[in-house]
Amino acid sequence: MKVLGISFGRKGHCSDILTKEALFEAKRCGADVEFINVIDLNIGHCTACGACGAARDRGKQVKCYRKDDYHILEEKVLDADGIVLAAPVYAVAPVGQLKNFIDRFGPAHDRAALNKEQERRKKEGMELLDARYFKDRPIAYISVGGAITQNWVSMGLPIMHLFGMSVKMKSVGRLDAYDMGRTANPVLDEKLMSRAAALGRSVAQNLGKPLEEMTFAGD
């Protein structure tokens, strides 16, 4: 089973480093791992056109019709069995690119709505929705901020949790890595790197479990 690490931060910097540390530990626990930095992807905002829901209601698969790079990340998330997500916080909340993805991915893949639609399709003998929509996935969140005080990154983790909320991912760990401006590089903080590794271990140990059996570890 595969753990996907997603970094919305600068290439080679704190978000990347902490995500990869989590992935290294997940791999040591026996999981396959994949890493993607999405900073160069063009992920535009949702236009509320309703096409994704309309396609679903017409018996088709869920699809966003905007022509950008959203689909690259969407497919990687759907293929994964567990997620480690990291994003920088510059002004209280995570970067807008993450929110753009959440706004398009979350409502389109809402598990409650998709469960209802899948039951309808079964009863009417229609083409079923993609089975990947219904995976139970563990996820761990890493909020990365340069601010010295926690209040300047206070909405980092809460907003990041929206990534997995409507699709029913289970949070199995989180890390609020603020004050990174003075730390300079996470590898200089042994305790921080250990906590990042613990997230990867938690995700790996919860792979393949039903949501009610997944356990939370960390802060």
Q: Where in the sequence are the language-model features?
A:
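N-terminal beta1-alpha1-beta2 submodule of the flavodoxin-like/Rossmannoid cofactor-binding fold
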Residues: 1-114, 180-219
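Beta-strand-loop-alpha "switch" segments that mediate conformational coupling across diverse proteins
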Residues: 173-178
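Short, glycine-/small-residue-rich phosphate/pyrophosphate-handling segment
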Residues: 97, 110-172
